[in-house]
């Protein structure tokens, strides 16, 4: 993705920002000169996150320009990040100051191990109260799953209009998705279909209908987006943000609009309990949750939750309003679902 093009879209989003001044009593006050100076003495902040490198780089550059503090960024999946931080915590040699990734793993591991420190900065006032966790603070973005399609292969009129339309036999062999015997997010998505259909029985019937289409099963949703964008398959189960990600590259990608429910995952950012650079970490959390960082993320298609900021995707406001957090499962429940879906999709 070209840096010049990315910042062009970001600039347009920045022009439309609205700042909310109402706050909540328990938030930290605006950052003091003392904190800024202490953070500058530390000189760096180490961040483990799941944002794509180009998006994170734009955010990190903004922070570095504003404060003169270097950001060292490591990108990984939620599983990789949590495993690494857990290992470091256990060894008493924490290298990371900040973690940001999907909400459920962060909640689970914090309850089990106490890996994180509570810090809710003044920039959190720009989020709806219902999206603010008492410990972690705002759910800063939602990674939302829908159905994307290649407009050169399927016209908007021909595209599915509902979950029921997706399992029409005419899409047999023409849809790609994450492999539900391998890909965590796809497993979570399928296991949450009761939130779409209102009952587990109807959800199970729909899942079997999806499997009957003999979808192309891939390692994750990233290659699903690639295959749809390239025209290898016309339809895919993937992140709605790919409409913007691939559209910016000239690919004719659209998504099924107007669904009653869009499932997905929330994301948190938190300081580690033993952060080597705690002052720089606080400063980074405040910046990350602020309007500038949110605009950068929205500009490349992310569904950020700071009020009034949307990605440049048609119908984005409806997607946000229709978002439902995917179900959380215990390890045993997850493994059971994984085996169940392996059997269903291998028939």
Q: Language-model segments: which ranges?
A:
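Extracellular/periplasmic bilobal clamshell ligand-binding domains
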Residues: 311-347
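A ligand-binding cleft/hinge motif common to bilobed small-molecule-binding domains
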Residues: 104-109, 229, 234-254
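Extracytoplasmic ligand-binding site segments that recognize negatively charged/polar headgroups
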Residues: 46-60, 72-89, 94-232
């Amino acid at each position: 993705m070209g840096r010049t093009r990315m910042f062009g879209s970001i600039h347009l989003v920045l022009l439309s920002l609205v700042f909310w001044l109402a706050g909540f009593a328990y938030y930290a006050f605006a950052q003091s000169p003392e904190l800024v100076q202490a953070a500058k003495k530390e000189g760096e902040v180490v961040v483990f996150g799941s944002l794509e490198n180009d998006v994170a780089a734009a955010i990190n550059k903004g922070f570095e320009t504003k404060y003169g503090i270097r950001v060292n960024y490591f990108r990984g999946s939620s599983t990789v990040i949590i495993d690494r931080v857990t290992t470091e915590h256990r060894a008493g040699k924490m290298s990371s100051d900040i973690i940001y990734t999907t909400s459920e793993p962060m909640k689970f591991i914090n309850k089990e191990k106490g890996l994180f420190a509570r810090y809710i900065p003044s920039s959190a006032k720009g989020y709806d109260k219902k999206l603010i966790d008492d410990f972690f603070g705002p759910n800063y973005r939602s990674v939302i799953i829908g159905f994307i399609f290649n407009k050169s292969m399927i016209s908007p009129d021909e595209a599915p209009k509902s979950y029921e339309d997706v399992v029409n036999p005419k899409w047999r062999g023409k849809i790609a998705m994450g492999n539900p015997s391998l890909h965590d997010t796809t497993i979570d998505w399928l296991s949450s279909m009761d939130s779409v259909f209102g009952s587990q029985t109807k959800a199970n019937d729909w899942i079997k209908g999806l499997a009957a289409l003999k979808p192309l099963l891939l390692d994750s949703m990233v290659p699903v987006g690639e295959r749809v964008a390239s025209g290898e398959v016309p339809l895919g189960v993937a992140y709605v943000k790919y409409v913007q990600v691939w559209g910016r590259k000239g690919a004719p990608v659209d998504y099924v609009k107007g669904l009653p429910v869009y499932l997905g995952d929330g994301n948190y950012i938190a300081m580690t309990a033993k952060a080597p650079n705690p002052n720089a970490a606080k400063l980074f959390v405040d910046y990350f949750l602020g309007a500038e960082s949110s605009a950068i993320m929205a500009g490349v298609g992310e569904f950020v939750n700071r009020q009034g900021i949307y990605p440049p995707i048609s119908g984005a406001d409806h997607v946000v309003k229709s978002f439902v957090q995917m179900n959380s499962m215990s390890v045993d429940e997850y493994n059971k679902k994984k085996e169940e879906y392996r059997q269903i999709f291998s028939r």
